[in-house]
């Protein structure tokens, strides 16, 4: 069978189901595909197909994730669902599944549970910008007041983590009944997708963001100058554009791009995803190095101190065998280079065990171009022992 061509006519949005174990995330994912399949906008996927998620590796960490895709009238969606709680933690922290919004599934019969809270916190820490709530298993609750109560609890919990609890859409439904083809509950799935369509904005495309390229390599061309190579992470770059070289030094250096090459051919414009070489005016070979970034002036700044949400690998994942404490000094790998940093654990946290998910403060020995949401790995002697996401810049 020929591969279907990917039609890019509708805007693309990445979403996922989050919430406590057994509250119905995977059943809901199956129900969405099944209901939309009846409208010819998806391929119906059974619960078992989604639940048997393949393992993937992201930054040396093994994560099981199921990917489904479907369309609504307005959009094309890529949807992730994870079988286990640990998979969510790893997924969100490594950015393996970057979500533009999430559907928080809460069982109306049980109300918010510990992982409900943890997934909301993670969403806040790693920058999932919007949440829509699906109160599931409403067919099992006859008491209207109880439903109101659970809804209030969920809204309060969202507000506690700085989401707009009062504005978040809450849809009351039953994923299982919808999956079984019960029309009144199928309608709730349609209602949910309308809420997702309307409430979660179309994300800004990577190309439309300000230009940034992590420097991977640097070389000189006699008579022409210095070339920095790398993959454009976001934005576009044209010949004549001003850029700043940021990181590893106290002051960013300003320069102008006098040439852009890709596969040894000259380009008018490079964009997000392209591997390029950028010729930099008036920059000597030793003024730019791997680990720095080229960026649109003023769009990103170098920092040394930040808070981060971190997942620490287990021994089985190739991580540490022993806990670590405050003042631990591993390497922090940002984009293309390692920088030593000193870890301070939050008050009341004595030590961190392999397999833990923790917030920490990090102070790097050299400044790096970072912003909220920047992902990194923690390494020790060349092996990955943790993965993190910057949650707050301190200085």
Curated annotation (Swiss-Prot):
Keywords: Cytoplasm, Elongation factor, GTP-binding, Hydrolase, Magnesium, Metal-binding, Nucleotide-binding, Protein biosynthesis. It holds the Pfam family GTP_EFTU. Residues 19-26 are annotated as: G1. It is an enzyme of class 3 (hydrolase). Residues 136-139 are annotated as: G4. PROSITE patterns: G_TR_1 (PS00301), G_TR_2 (PS51722). PANTHER family: ELONGATION FACTOR TU, MITOCHONDRIAL, ELONGATION FACTOR TU-RELATED. This is Elongation factor Tu. The gene is tuf.
């Amino acid at each position: 069978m020929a591969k279907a061509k990917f039609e890019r006519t509708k805007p693309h949005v990445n979403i996922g189901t989050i919430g406590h174990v057994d509250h119905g995330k995977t059943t809901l994912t199956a129900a969405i595909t099944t209901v939309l399949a009846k409208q010819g906008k998806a391929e119906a996927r059974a619960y078992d197909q989604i639940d048997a998620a393949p393992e993937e590796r992201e930054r040396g960490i093994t994560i099981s994730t199921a990917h489904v895709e479907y369309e609504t009238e307005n959009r094309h969606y890529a949807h992730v669902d994870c079988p286990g709680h640990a998979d969510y933690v790893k997924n969100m922290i490594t950015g393996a599944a970057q979500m533009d919004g999430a559907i928080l599934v809460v069982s109306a019969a049980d109300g918010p549970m510990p992982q409900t809270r943890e997934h909301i916190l993670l969403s806040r820490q790693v920058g999932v910008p919007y949440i829509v709530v699906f109160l599931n298993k409403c067919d099992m609750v006859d008491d209207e007041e109880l439903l109101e109560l659970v809804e209030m609890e969920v809204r309060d919990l969202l507000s506690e983590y700085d989401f707009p609890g009062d504005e978040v859409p809450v849809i009351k439904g039953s994923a299982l009944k919808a999956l079984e083809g019960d029309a009144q509950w199928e309608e709730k799935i349609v209602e949910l997708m309308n809420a997702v369509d309307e409430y979660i904005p179309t994300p800004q495309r990577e190309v439309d963001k300000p230009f940034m390229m992590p420097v991977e390599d640097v070389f000189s061309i006699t008579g022409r100058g210095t070339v920095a190579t790398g993959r454009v992470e976001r934005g576009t770059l044209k010949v004549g554009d001003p850029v700043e070289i940021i990181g590893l030094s106290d002051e960013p250096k300003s320069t102008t791009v006098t040439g852009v090459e890709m596969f040894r051919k000259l380009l008018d414009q490079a964009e997000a995803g392209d591997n390029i070489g950028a010729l930099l005016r008036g920059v000597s070979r030793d003024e730019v190095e791997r680990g720095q970034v080229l960026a649109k002036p003023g769009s990103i700044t170098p920092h040394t101190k930040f808070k981060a949400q971190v997942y620490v690998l287990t021994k089985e994942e190739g991580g540490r065998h022993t806990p670590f404490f405050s003042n631990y000094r591993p390497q922090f790998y940002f984009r293309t280079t390692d920088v030593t940093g000193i870890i301070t654990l939050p008050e009341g946290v004595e030590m961190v065990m392999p397999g833990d998910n923790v917030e920490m403060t990090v102070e790097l020995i050299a400044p790096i171009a970072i912003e909220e949401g920047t992902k990194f790995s923690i390494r020790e002697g060349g092996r990955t022992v943790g993965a993190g996401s910057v949650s707050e810049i301190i200085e």
